[in-house]
Amino acid sequence: MPLSPDVLAAALKAATSYVVNAVEVLRFGGLQTDEETSPYEIVAHRPMFRLRRYFAQDAGEAPGTPVVLIPPMMISADVWDVSPATSAVAALHAADLDPWVVDFGSPDLEDGGLERTLTDHVVAVSEAVDLVVAATGRSVHLAGYSQGGMFCYQA
């Protein structure tokens, strides 16, 4: 199924709204929603990031175009999937897209995390894109929230 610009724009607009809502949730109390998050698998683990593939169980059903979502530094990758009502990854999946998320982890908990540079993040995004292309055989769309968008632009 070819991806039309209108479908992608609508899905990314919805995803942006969900991220804004998710940031508000974080601001007012965190991610404790007692709701199920979307299923994902960690398909790659690197010192700089983990690559999540959401709805991997559906991957054998000819998933749509891959969309790689990039969070900003210091914000949990869970911002893309706080709850079913505010889940960017669920909205993308419902639009027949194949959502992936780059998880940089918590710098204070990751080995060498506090020494990471902006360049390290940009290189990590580039590597994640290569991994998704290798896994799917398809070109990807990148979407980033705040500083994550800048990482996409620079990658």
PLM feature segments, named:
Residues A143-C152:
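Gly/Ala-rich beta-loop-alpha elbow adjacent to hydrolase catalytic centers
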Residues E115-R116, L142:
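Flexible, glycine/proline-enriched loop segments at strand-loop-helix junctions
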Residues M1-D34:
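N-terminal targeting or regulatory segments adjacent to alpha/beta-hydrolase or S9 domains
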Residues D103, V132, G144:
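Glycine-rich adenosine-cofactor-binding loop
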Residues G30-L31, I70-P71, D111:
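Generic signal for short, ordered secondary-structure residues
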Residues T117-H121:
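Short, hinge-like loop/turn segments at secondary-structure boundaries
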Residues E36-D108:
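Short, surface-exposed "cap/lid" segments of acyl-processing enzymes
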Residues P107-G112, V122-V140, Y153:
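Conserved acidic catalytic loop of the alpha/beta-hydrolase fold
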